Amino acid sequence: MSESKNSGENTLSVTPTKTLSLKRPVEAGTVRQSFPHGRSKAVVVEKVKRRPIGPGGDGHPAREAAPTPAPAATVTAPPPAQRPAAPNPTAAPTTPPAAAVPNVPPPAPRAEVAPPSAQPAPAAPTAATPPAQPKAEPVPAPIAAQAAPAPVPPVPAPSAPVPSTSAAPAAPKPAPAPVSQAKPIQTAPVQTAPAAQASASQTTGPRPVAAGPRPATGAAKQATATPQRGAASPAQRPQTGGGQRSGGQQRNQSGGRGGPGRGESGSSRTPTGVVLRSLTDEEREARARALSGARIREEEDRKRAAAEAKAREEREAREREERAAAEARKAEEDARRLQEQEAKRRSEQEAKRRLSGGEPAPAASPSVARKPVMTATAAAPAAAAPSGRAAVTDEEETKRVIRRPGMPTKVIVPPRPTKGAEPKSRGRLTVATATGGEEEERTRSVAAFRRRQQRLRGHVNEVKEKLSREVILPETITIQELANRMSERGVDVIKLLMKQGQMAKITDVIDADTAQLIAEELGHTVKRVAESDVEEGLFDTVDVEEHLVPRPPVVTIMGHVDHGKTSLLDAIRHANVVSGEAGGITQHIGAYQITAPNGSPITFIDTPGHAAFTAMRARGAKVTDIVVLVVAADDGVMPQTAEAVAHARAAGVPIIVAINKIDKPDAKPERIRSELLQYEVQVESLGGDTLEVEVSATKKINLDKLLDLIALQAELLDLKANPDRAAEGTVIEASLDKGRGPVATVLVQRGTLRVGDIIVGGTHWGHVRALIDDKGATRSEAGPSMPVEVLGFSGSPEAGDRVAVVETEARAREITEYRERQRREQAAARGGQARGSLADMMSQLKNAGRKEFPLVIKGDVQGSVEAVVATLEKLNTDEVAARIIHAGVGGITESDITLAQAAGAVVLGFNVRALKEARALAEQQGIEIRYYNIIYNLVDDVKAAMSGLLAPTLREEMLGNAEILEVFNISKVGKVAGCRVTDGRVERGAHVRLIRDNVVVHEGKLSTLKRFKDEVKEVVAGQECGMAFESYQDMRPHDVIECYNVHEIKRSL
């Protein structure tokens, strides 16, 4: 058989006398190859088996396939005489140091043949007495052994063969062969016994002659630099058995290409009877991929083994250090323990000697004292000294003389410390011990530890006294800031609020009263301060008595609606204000000044009598000096009359009762006097102190008498004011005029208001641009008790705000900013409390499903807007409510339309109109604008719209009853109940209620009603019919059917 790499030499020759081999099966496996220092490598092993078909014709004995191990044995042209008997590796001498090469893996997987001069042949053992070698077991060869190395340049062989006795080198321990990329090596016969080797050497006698001059044969290719590696340190040799080494030598001697086992010559090719073929491209690629994968795996295994070895070395070094440290600590502890025992023993001996009165005990020699404690690892701590107590005792008794009767006087000499011994540390830190470099830990005594524990225990049980702090509280403060000022936890403050029924967060704002309660509850003192210090000296400064002069009285006319208040004022002023009022009712508060018959001026304030204008009446009562209570003689005391009495009592002003409309035939003044007694108003005619007068506004009866009573009451009050000071007053009404801007009706109470003064009213300030009196005339100044319209405010102040004149704009700006900030904080505090209180939380849950009617309200004056908002809020119920999106003074603008469009609200204008641009935008967006000049109409329309949002009331109308006699199952219709109408009638489409055993099991509608086979509209009592219900089939005999209609009834507020 022959094999060639050239395509032209692919020839097959078959000899009849040779055996024909089949395809060799291959078995693959993996073995772990170990190396010194804990390194290992995974090697892939392929096991190739040969199965002979016929007996051999070459005379060789039957051989079994035995793969050889991976290490390649060294070959230096062994003679055939030495091949059967392999020398014992243990008896062979090692390679000289000159031929040793470090055990470094070659850079490339190719083997080089060592030159003969670099490998001197040492003396080999006698071939006659080879050691008995056991039969080598088949060992899987690694893949490195199956790959032949790449061809190398031929190495010149020795000129003459070496004799068998001296040329056989000692077989060193094989080293791992490098991985190479060549075709696998054929299986070699395993050396089984010396007898078989001898027969093989006889058969191949002349083969060594041909093996010499052919260095490129299989044996020469496999002869790598193994002698150099074999000469390395023994720790790097793999632990293999003698049988494996013999097998390796046998493979190199007989199995290599061109070797002795091949034939007489490497160049001569004789037919062997085995058919070979060249490898295909797919097989070459597969083998190349397998070899590349093996190299990659080998590289990964090498890196992994290196990392594991490094980690193992570090771990072993760390363990060694830990063991050494533990042994050192144990030795030091033993030395210290022995030292203490020795010191204790000496102290006891010294104490016994003193008690017995004998001689001092001789000091132990240093060697004896240190002998039990001297160790190789702890020599320094072995030097022990007496304990501190014994040393002090010896020092005290050194100079003491013991005199006993019958005993010579002696001076007790304490034992001298051993030379080089160091005194034991007494737990005290000195400069010597601190700088001596001793590493002994300075321990604390048990007594010191107990004292520390008692001290700590005493601090724990000590009752800390609570500190009382002075807490400065502003008008509003957050919970966090309050807790910080009290040095308390915020959680404790929140707990106190929860006890009071308020759910609050630590960032919520609370008012000063709540903060004061919390601070006092926690044991602190409170000092209330406010930012209102900026307003000090602004109002209520005391005037000098000499500067006071009489001023006109301010009279407020109050009473029920339609009792003639404005008519009475018109009769006094000789004017006709009633004719210009919408609906004949007063909806604004008016201020006028007239001259009495005696020449003294009197200021009148006309208030609305409608129930919606309660706030106006309250403001009028606050700024007035006298209240004129107008009561119609034909109508009696009404609710607003009683309310006016209450306002006057709250303001503390006197009341003059004016019984109006006495000219009517049904007038009953005496009934008015008796009815006022129910409200604790007792007139003079009934023995009281309240002045009364019967008047008629239309007939102008007793008007002068009324004015005289007003002058008398003012004289009794002794009304005075200082006109030569900064003006103070009250805003009675405020509005936003299109041409004049913000306009405020101010009643000057003290001082004199002049044009150009800097005034502050509420959250707005400005320069007085103009002063207009009640007759429309422009005035340069206004004295006490004079009502004027003031122009020049930066915005519309609210009705009821106090007005004062300040010196500079900076002061005015500071005051207004403080008031604005205060208003925001108070609103936030109210909102936070509203969110947190339990009652408001329940109210929010109750109003969760309530429908809302959004509104945008614009009015002519501030008082009218307040009245409209208050009236609409009274219409709210649990089901529907009017939600005021925005309420303001002035005409309807584009911003109002945009706000209404975003909220889906209706715009209501009270005595105002919309601008042209606002009307165009409202038409474009589809926003409804409604105008009103009478508050009755506005309230009625809103009430009707809110009533439409209420769910209607459902009322049932019973029609009749029927009883099911039988249930029929119709294929296309379903189940149909055959019924008899017991009373009333049954209508198709009506509501039905199915009752079974007095329990309602279904409510629905009657979908089908038939009389025989005809569809009918209704069936009266006593007749039978068929019924079918919508989406219900579970009908049973003897069920009762109630038929009824449902009517919806609209609701109203």
From Swiss-Prot:
G4: annotated span: 660-663
Subcellular location: Cytoplasm
Pfam families: EF-G_D2 (PF22042), GTP_EFTU (PF00009), GTP_EFTU_D2 (PF03144), IF-2 (PF11987), IF2_assoc (PF08364), IF2_N (PF04760)
Basic and acidic residues bias (residue ranges): 279-288, 295-353
Binding sites annotated in the UniProt record for GTP: 559-566, 606-610, 660-663
Annotated Low complexity bias: 64-76, 83-102, 178-220, 375-386
A GO CC term assigned to this protein in UniProt: cytosol
Region (G3): 606-609
The organism's place on the tree of life at top rank: Bacteria
Residues covered by region (G2): 584-588
NCBIfam families linked to this entry: IF-2, small_GTP
Name of the molecule in the record: Translation initiation factor IF-2
Naturally occurring in which organism (per UniProt): Beijerinckia indica subsp. indica (strain ATCC 9039 / DSM 1715 / NCIMB 8712)
Organismal lineage: Bacteria, Pseudomonadati, Pseudomonadota, Alphaproteobacteria, Hyphomicrobiales
